[in-house]
């Protein structure tokens, strides 16, 4: 989340250095040193630094490389992050930095993400673009879970933007020893030749694995127990950043 968002322009590697302020200062931990991680990574990689005045995190955006970006109102418009921002000003800065042209907004993210250690609605646990041009969308089928109410509006927003939506079911595990969980297979990492998918020791793990294998036939898809990461408010995609290979 605190790392740079890598971009490529005319075969030159760059990285957007967003302002990081601890997810709108929504954490009990000291994040002051985390705020310097992006610039340090860019120095180490030799990528061109593109500073941005926008408070944003890696998990707060999802892009398809074709001009589209997914955003969440409770993240980019969070008073603790960007108190004077509007959708228009956010989109202008996002498009300027990433080269995107169109934004699709969700009202909010998953319920647990608003509790302790949460990000207040990161989109990378809700939706992800896949190679065939469709969007994987987290779907909670347990109607007692608060996240079950999100599907209709999020699906409508994507379909109105012209996207085919693929449901990626939530694990059947709905609660841990604290409260409702935000376990999500959407929060996966795509690397060169592989896809790393979260697992939760749930019978839905294998079903999700097969869905991702069908979508990434040219990559080895494997899964890894991610319950500890999710317990602390993160996930596999949350703790990684995609750096494109530029030679």
Question: Where are these predicted regions, by residue range?
Answer:
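The feature marks the mature, well-folded catalytic cores of soluble enzymes
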Residues: 1-247
């Amino acid at each position: 989340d605190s790392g740079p968002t890598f971009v490529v322009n005319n075969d030159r590697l760059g990285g957007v250095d967003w302002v990081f302020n601890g997810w709108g200062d929504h954490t009990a931990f000291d994040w002051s040193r985390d705020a310097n991680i992006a610039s340090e990574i860019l120095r180490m990689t030799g990528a061109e630094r593109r500073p941005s005045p926008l408070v944003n995190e890696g998990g707060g955006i999802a892009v398809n490389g074709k001009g589209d970006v997914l955003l969440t109102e409770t993240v980019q418009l969070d008073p603790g992050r960007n108190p004077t921002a509007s959708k228009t000003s956010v989109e202008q800065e996002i498009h300027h930095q990433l080269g995107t042209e169109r934004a699709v907004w969700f009202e909010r993210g998953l319920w647990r993400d608003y509790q302790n250690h949460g990000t207040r609605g990161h989109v990378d646990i809700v939706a992800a673009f896949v190679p065939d041009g469709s969007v994987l969308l987290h779907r909670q089928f347990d109607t007692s879970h608060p996240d079950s109410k999100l599907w209709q509006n999020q699906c409508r927003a994507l379909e109105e933007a012209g996207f085919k939506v693929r449901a990626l079911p939530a694990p059947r595990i709905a609660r841990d020893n604290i409260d409702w969980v935000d376990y999500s297979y959407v929060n996966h990492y795509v690397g060169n030749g592989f896809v790393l998918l979260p697992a939760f020791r749930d019978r839905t793990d294998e079903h999700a694995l097969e869905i991702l294998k069908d979508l990434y036939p040219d990559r080895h898809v494997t899964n890894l127990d991610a319950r500890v990461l999710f317990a602390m408010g993160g996930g596999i995609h949350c703790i990684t950043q995609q750096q494109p290979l530029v030679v």
